[in-house]
Amino acid sequence: MKLRSTALVKGFRQSAPYVNAHSGKTVVIMLGGEAIADPNFANIVNDIALLNSLGLQIVVVYGARPQISHLLTSQGYTTPYHKGIRVTDARALELVKQAAGQLQLDITARFSMGLNNTPMAGAQINVISGNFIIAQPLGIDDGIDYYHTGRIRRIDIDGIQRQLNQHSIVLLGPVASSVTGECFNLTSEEVATQLAIRLKADKLIGFCSEQGVIDLDGEVASEMLPNEAETALQRLIEAQEDDCGTARFLRGAVSACRAGVPRSHLISYKEDGALIQELFSLDGIGTQIVMASAEKVRGAGIDDIGGILDLIYPLEQEGILVRRSREQLEQEIEQFTIIERDGLIIACAALYPFPDEKIAEMACVAVHPDFRDGDRGVILLNRLRQQAKEQRLKHVFVLTTRSVHWFLEQGFIESDVEQLPMAKKALYNFQRRSKILVLAV
């Protein structure tokens, strides 16, 4: 008898909305030399190939900093850095080209694998590299001549887009030529960032040794706005870690975000499957830098009824919430406020006003179990209090059997049935014996 894995089926079904959401989207992936040297790199290539098969348009930008440094050291040669950028003289340039060229061949070979019983079986991926980027010299800064270190002059966006439209993966490295036929050493951060901006990419993805950006509590920050990412970058600079992979990515991510790239993701190159977990699960695994929060608080509409029913059904089954039918929700949908994340309703609450008695009921408060550690309940409470104020009401009340302490922590006080509005008092269920809690608006 064949073994059946319900976990596989469940995971596949849960990922379906993300497969649909990401299909056809443009993603720029920045692979530093550290990621390429890690034993997990083969799995990263497999995961990128999977993204390609799912219809994502992918540009891979690889760096070669540790490989270049190793090659220079093996030749007994060192190069100075100025403002975190390598000064590349003529001798160093030859070694840079050697290291970058070797990596290009190795990465292309990885994507070309097609052995049976491997994740690459039948993939048949076309990897395209070329002179899509034209460079120019970085010049002299503070009296320091960068020689053959350069920056981007222009990018052939149309040429890259043609390759992406043909379902090819575009692979670009840290060496580009100029209009004079010279070669220049570029930073992979600049290449990836500028590509993401000019391609109007949907995502910029980078890899570091950690799971993402580590906050002051030692935890992975799941989401950051650009100003928060800048603060994290400043902490790294003050700790003299401004040359680490996280710092280099954050610089690019902040620039990309402010130039219109909706999301940048930072994940670990050591974690097997991090790329898939980040893109195809509700809360991801790393850190994303976003133009605006991925969560939106808004009034509910008819199209949200299915999502609200899915959210509250488990709580109704446990007896925590009173059951609401689809028909009832359709009639009352304008009373609901929701928190939405990536198209999924993760929290809801409703406000039912009794204007004659200057009071309103806060009801059907529910938060998705994966997001109960945050302050989403408080966010909904504050939004509903504001709505009550705007309606010139003086109090809100709740009926609850399980969440008494949480409401008390938010400033509610216990009351009794006599304090309920007349219409609600007539419907009070004495068998359920819900606690009545009231809060001044």
From Swiss-Prot:
E.C. number: 2.3.1.1
Subcellular location(s) per record: Cytoplasm
A cellular component annotation (GO) from this entry: cytoplasm
Catalytic activity: L-glutamate + acetyl-CoA = N-acetyl-L-glutamate + CoA + H(+)
Keywords: Acyltransferase, Amino-acid biosynthesis, Arginine biosynthesis, Cytoplasm, Transferase
One Pfam assignment: AA_kinase
Record carries keyword Nucleotide-binding: no
Domain N-acetyltransferase as annotated: residue spans: 295-434
Similarity annotation: Belongs to the acetyltransferase family. ArgA subfamily.
Matches recorded under HAMAP family: N_acetyl_glu_synth
Name this protein carries in UniProt: Amino-acid acetyltransferase
